[in-house]
């Protein structure tokens, strides 16, 4: 199956030129990735990768990037963090329709991971809810990629928790 996802990285300043990085990425198996370098010190790679599973597609891409540029630091795997407009775009409805659906089901619509001037959700639980509760036709490949992206992003963030704090928090947040 074909899986579409984006890997975003921080690149240390002491790395070679962008052209050299792109060449290394190609040699490591990322030759079909669309490379974005719009912000200094950042690189984004958009993949459409054929694999047996989303996990295999994303993990093999991560491994290839780390082989090509060992000093990069993963910032985010997408699609994962989304606003209401992003969710609406994913399922092909207007933002207003998605907002109406969310408000009509406020008791069981997935809880955002951040509420501020704009709320943010993990895409995976929202897509699962839309498929199971609202009967939207969500492509399995999108759902699988969103799930693995969320798992990777959560793991990356959780790795920053101090061990002592983590033990105490497990009971408090469960």
Question: What annotation goes with each model-predicted range?
Answer:
Residues 42-54:
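A short, exposed loop/beta-hairpin motif centered on an aromatic-Gly-Thr core
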Residues 93-119:
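Major-groove DNA-recognition helix of helix-turn-helix-type DNA-binding domains
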Residues 78-100:
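Polyanion-binding surface elements
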Residues 13-20, 53-58:
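Short, conserved charged micro-motifs
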Residues 125-174:
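A short, Lys/Arg-enriched interface patch at domain edges and termini
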Residues 17-42:
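A short, structured beta-strand/loop element
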Residues 32-38, 63-80:
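Conserved short beta-strand edge segments in small beta-sheet-based binding/regulatory domains
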Residues 1-13, 82:
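Short glycine-/aliphatic-rich beta-strand segments at the starts of folded cytosolic domains
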């Amino acid at each position: 199956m074909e899986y579409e996802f984006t890997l975003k990285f921080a690149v240390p300043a002491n790395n070679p030129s962008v052209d050299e990085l792109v060449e290394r990425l190609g040699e490591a198996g990322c030759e079909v990735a669309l490379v974005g370098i719009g912000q200094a010190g950042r690189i984004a790679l958009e993949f459409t990768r054929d694999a047996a599973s989303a996990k295999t597609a994303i993990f093999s891409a991560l491994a290839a990037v780390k082989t090509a540029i060992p000093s990069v630091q993963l910032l985010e795997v997408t699609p994962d963090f989304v606003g209401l407009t992003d969710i609406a775009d994913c399922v092909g409805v207007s933002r207003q329709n998605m907002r109406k659906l969310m408000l009509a089901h406020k008791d069981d619509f997935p809880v955002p991971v951040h509420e501020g001037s704009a709320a943010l959700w993990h895409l995976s639980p929202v897509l699962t809810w839309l498929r199971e509760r609202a009967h939207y036709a969500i492509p399995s490949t999108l759902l699988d990629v969103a799930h693995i992206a969320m798992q990777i992003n959560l793991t990356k963030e959780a790795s920053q928790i101090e061990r002592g704090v983590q033990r105490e928090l497990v009971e408090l947040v469960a």
